[in-house]
Amino acid sequence: MKTFRLLTALTLGTLLWGCAESGKKAEGPFYTDIESRAQLHDWFRYAPERPIVVSGHRGGMVTGYPENCIESFEKTLSMMPSFFEIDPRLTKDSVIVLMHDATIDRTTTGTGKVSDYTFEELQQFFLKDREGNVTPYKIPTLEECIVWSRGKTILNLDIKDVHSSSVGI
């Protein structure tokens, strides 16, 4: 229950921080621009006249698009109303990046632990899609993802090895 409350607070905080920082409205096929806690609750409340909303676990499962990648989030949002569960991890130089696993072996062209690399070192690798195909995409930072998400979608942070105070919410 404590973990659920923490994740809810982080999700809400990320969403509202993004809305407060956003000076302009984003436009896209299924973008969601939520400006208050009440709107957030309404958005998650079932209403038969509204389209079904998908939780994109790690960003979705589209061939050619890797998990925990902004381009994947954008692709999923182009197809359906979505919010995204993402996985923050800490690099050796304390940059928060998106990566589900503690290692980069499965999802990138590199090997080893995320925490053994600096952010700059991680940028030499390319992300792979779920079939293992190499894509042109790189590992994003949590900050890049939050900036991208403003006025577009909701992020649900699945806290791994990053302390919640590091997220700044």
Predicted regions and their residues:
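Bacterial Sec-dependent N-terminal signal peptides
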Residues: 1-27
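Phosphate-group recognition and catalysis centered on beta-loop-alpha active-site segments
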Residues: 19-169
